[in-house]
Amino acid sequence: MKMETFLVCLFHNAKGLHQQIQEILYLLRMHIYETNLYLKQELSQLIYPNRQLSFVLLMPLSLLRNWDDIEYLTDIVDDKQTLHYAANLLTNYVLHLSMYQKLTKQYFLLAVKRVSEKLNKKQQHSFYEVLVTSEALNNYENLPKNILNTLMFAVRYVFNPTPNYSEILAELKKKNKIHHIIFNMVITDFQQIREQQMCKHLCETNNELRQECKEIIFDLKVVGNV
């Protein structure tokens, strides 16, 4: 399962998180056809103390499975750091879903709105600064138009309101290269978390996992630059 390899790679050296990843993925595989209530009861036992890890794992997987009650996952998260991280991760997963044509707008929009509402109440600065200042803007080839449009939809809801929305939207459309920018935002958050929890990012040193990460993240050749 490539999702496992990717997650283990990202969280490898965070204390105690490797086992959490395995437990959550096991529950998802074993009980994916059970009722949502049963899933919530099982998964809620893993939410604390690693709330952030549980959220970032469950949110994208729940989107892929089209769960009806994504609200449960967003309701348990209130701290600013996790909301910041979740907003970035949600945007990144729009790329994943749209690439494989699995994006169901109503499910995605529900999750994005829930995170965005909380996020906008807790912090005022715009994430767009990360987007427009990224050196990666000029490094990669253009995305197909339909995927770009899907991502623009995501950006519109995740990062609204923002003071410079019109200017930055125009900049993104002009560049037409949003995939690596979104990924860069996620990596920025990984760097912040790494300063607090991680000794070293496994992808920096392990060539085999780095290659698999490249394949997972749509072969954009970004992971090697992390």
From Swiss-Prot:
Q: Which residues are glycosylated?
A: N164
User: Keywords for this entry?
Assistant: Glycoprotein, Host-virus interaction, Inhibition of host NF-kappa-B by virus, Signal
For the keyword Glycoprotein, the answer is: yes
TM stretches of this protein: none
User: Under what conditions is it induced?
Assistant: Expressed in the intermediate phase of the viral replicative cycle (immediately after DNA replication).
GO terms classed as biological process: symbiont-mediated suppression of host NF-kappaB cascade
Where does the record locate the signal sequence feature? 1-16
Task: Give the function comment from the record.
Answer: Plays a role in the inhibition of host NF-kappa-B and IRF3 signaling pathways. Mechanistically, promotes the degradation of host IKBKG through enhancing its ubiquitination leading to inhibition of both pathways.
The UniProt entry's sequence similarity note says: Belongs to the asfivirus I226R family.
The identity of this protein, by name, is Late protein I226R
- This protein's species is African swine fever virus (isolate Tick/Malawi/Lil 20-1/1983) (ASFV)
Its lineage opens with: Viruses, Varidnaviria, Bamfordvirae, Nucleocytoviricota, Pokkesviricetes
